């Protein structure tokens, strides 16, 4: 069985790490480089760097920041935000990213997923899916959660898999920053209906939530921010807790 991964996420805007609730009310969560160094030393399996205002502001991810982070970490680095072309993905890879995360641009131009996958391999393409419950449906949103789309979560997950995505980053906007736990219902439905890895995101508030994301949500990896940024728990603590509960992790 493949080891489950713990992935801290750096939501970045204005040159700082930030964290909000339900994609709103952002507060400062520290220096980008200090957080990156911390997670590199803390046995994080990977690191995600998301420029959360790039698509909203119709601009590109700051390559200088990506290069600085990539120079500080020796774990796989996924970069997202404003990646809307193969050329832009190339720039991000050249500045040290191991994977790119596409979201808004993938919805607007689904062929972008295939084009990046064909050039760099599916393993280098993460499709971020931001979902919000509307009625009984989990609807996909773009532009940092501002714009609803016509896609339902399962429908879009299947489509991105067919287009060549190597991984899905599934974020519940309803749970984001609430520390109430992942939305394990939709997480399990997506995870069990696709054959590519699914990363749980949005809502981790304690170590039991990570465990539930793996056991109830069937996630392949758990992404978290608040519980690690503000040092509520260390990643070493999280991994030991999971190992003690029978979850295979790298320690």
From Swiss-Prot:
Q: Which GO terms describe its biological process?
A: L-histidine biosynthetic process
- Indicate the transmembrane segments per the record: none
Task: State the pathway, as annotated in the record.
Answer: Amino-acid biosynthesis; L-histidine biosynthesis; L-histidine from 5-phospho-alpha-D-ribose 1-diphosphate: step 5/9
Q: Which InterPro entries match?
A: Aldolase_TIM, His_biosynth, HisF, IGPS_HisA/HisF, RibuloseP-bd_barrel
Q: Which Pfam families match?
A: His_biosynth
Listed GO MF terms: imidazoleglycerol-phosphate synthase activity; lyase activity
| Major site of localization recorded for this protein | cytoplasm
The UniProt entry's GO CC annotations, sorted and at most eight, read:
cytoplasm
Q: Which UniProt keywords apply?
A: Amino-acid biosynthesis, Cytoplasm, Histidine biosynthesis, Lyase
State the reactions this protein catalyses: 5-[(5-phospho-1-deoxy-D-ribulos-1-ylimino)methylamino]-1-(5-phospho-beta-D-ribosyl)imidazole-4-carboxamide + L-glutamine = D-erythro-1-(imidazol-4-yl)glycerol 3-phosphate + 5-amino-1-(5-phospho-beta-D-ribosyl)imidazole-4-carboxamide + L-glutamate + H(+)
EC number in record: 4.3.2.10
Localization recorded for this chain is: Cytoplasm
Q: Where is the active site?
A: 11, 130
The record's HAMAP family line, in alphabetical order, gives: HisF (MF_01013)
- Hey, which family's this protein in? Belongs to the HisA/HisF family.
As for what it does, the entry says: IGPS catalyzes the conversion of PRFAR and glutamine to IGP, AICAR and glutamate. The HisF subunit catalyzes the cyclization activity that produces IGP and AICAR from PRFAR using the ammonia provided by the HisH subunit.
- Subunit record text: Heterodimer of HisH and HisF.
Instruction: Please report the name of this protein according to its UniProt entry.
Output: Imidazole glycerol phosphate synthase subunit HisF
The gene it comes from is hisF
């Amino acid at each position: 069985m493949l080891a489950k991964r713990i992935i801290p996420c750096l939501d970045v805007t204005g040159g700082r790490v930030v964290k909000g609730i339900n994609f709103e009310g952002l507060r400062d969560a520290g220096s980008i480089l200090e957080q990156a160094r911390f997670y590199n030393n803390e046995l994080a399996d990977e690191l995600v760097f998301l420029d959360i205002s790039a698509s909203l502001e119709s601009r590109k991810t700051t390559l200088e920041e990506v290069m600085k982070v990539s120079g500080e970490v020796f774990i796989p680095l996924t970069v997202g935000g404003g990646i809307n072309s193969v050329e832009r993905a190339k720039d991000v890879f050249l500045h040290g990213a191991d994977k790119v995360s596409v979201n808004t641009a993938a919805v607007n131009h689904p062929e972008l997923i295939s084009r990046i996958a064909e050039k760099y391999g599916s393993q280098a393409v993460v499709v971020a899916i931001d979902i919000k419950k509307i009625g009984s449906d989990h609807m996909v949103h773009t532009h940092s959660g501002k714009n609803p789309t016509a896609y339902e979560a399962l429908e879009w997950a299947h489509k991105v898999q067919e287009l060549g995505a190597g991984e899905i980053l599934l974020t519940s906007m309803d749970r984001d920053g609430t520390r109430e736990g992942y939305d394990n219902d939709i997480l399990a439905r997506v995870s069990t209906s696709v054959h590519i890895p699914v990363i749980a995101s949005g809502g981790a508030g304690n170590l039991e939530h990570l465990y539930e994301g793996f056991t109830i949500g069937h996630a392949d990896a758990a992404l978290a921010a608040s519980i690690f940024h503000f040092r509520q728990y260390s990643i070493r603590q999280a991994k030991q807790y999971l190992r003690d509960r029978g979850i295979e992790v790298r320690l």
